[in-house]
Amino acid sequence: MYKDIATPTRTKEILEKYGFSFKKSLGQNFLIEPNILHRIVDFAQLSERTGVIEIGPGIGALTEQLARRAKKVVAFEIDQRLLPILADTLSPYTNVSIIHEDILKADVQQVIAEQFTDVDDIMVVANLPYYVTTPIIMKLLTDRLPIRGMVVMLQKEVADRMAAKPGTKDYGSLTIAVQYYTHAETVMHVPRTVFVPKPNVDSAVIRLLKREQPAVSVSNEDFFFAVVRASFGQRRKTILNNLLNQLPNGKEKKEQIENALANAGIDPKRRGETLAIAEFATLSEQLYPIFYEEA
């Protein structure tokens, strides 16, 4: 039986052996509490037929737990200094592939086609670097990858925004974007004390299970998200004011925008954070002909 990597003693041994120093610019914080890793893997509900994509494996603490449960693990690591460490710590596992590439620049669709030829389902499981959490998640969602979902650790504040409900302070355009594609649920809070080095923020684990179809049906997704972003442009302003100020030539189309709100059954004095995703969809459909009739 191999010793878990994610203990203070074992992590220190590995880092000292390789003279590794953390790069703040890469948001490197390594977990040193194996029980938390076990729970993350449990939340992912892996089987012996599951393929896993990991982002930022670090020294392999989560990777080894995934390798023990999944059919195959493919991990993207941007820091070249970690490659020899991973080759060492993960040497007992024949079902792990490390790809030295920035996930944001990678053709993940192609990687899936090449690496996961014999799996029943695919999950993304990762302790994400906090400085690029949102871009990574949005890339994985908008690329329409054939994944079942994600279980990822990230900054608690970001997890709160992704899983927020309408009318709360955390509810915003990120909430809508994530919940358009997935069912989002915060499944665990993680204190900053279980990492080295200790981050300045607390963490949370969020589970995003992909919807078979988006949460709402819209004519144009780009325009739908433009309306959502416009509605949250200035949180203290009404939805009408935000649409007038944030949409192209909005002020020139004031009467049409007011009519669109009326047709959607939305009080123009409401604020964006009070609208449910279905209301944004209805509003987007009413506004779409106004802004695309000349397009």
UniProtKB/Swiss-Prot annotation:
Subcellular location: Cytoplasm
Protein's recorded name: Ribosomal RNA small subunit methyltransferase A
Reaction(s) this enzyme catalyzes, per UniProt: adenosine(1518)/adenosine(1519) in 16S rRNA + 4 S-adenosyl-L-methionine = N(6)-dimethyladenosine(1518)/N(6)-dimethyladenosine(1519) in 16S rRNA + 4 S-adenosyl-L-homocysteine + 4 H(+)
UniProt-listed InterPro entries: KsgA/Erm, rRNA_Ade_diMease-like_C, rRNA_Ade_Mease_Trfase_CS, rRNA_Ade_methylase_Trfase_N, rRNA_adenine_dimethylase, SAM-dependent_MTases_sf
Keyword Lipid metabolism: no
Family: Belongs to the class I-like SAM-binding methyltransferase superfamily. rRNA adenine N(6)-methyltransferase family. RsmA subfamily.
Keywords per UniProt: Cytoplasm, Methyltransferase, RNA-binding, rRNA processing, S-adenosyl-L-methionine, Transferase
Top-level EC class: transferase
Major site of localization recorded for this protein: cytoplasm
GO cellular component: cytosol
Pfam families assigned: RrnaAD (PF00398)
SMART domains membership: rADc
Entry binding sites for S-adenosyl-L-methionine: 29, 31, 56, 77, 102, 127
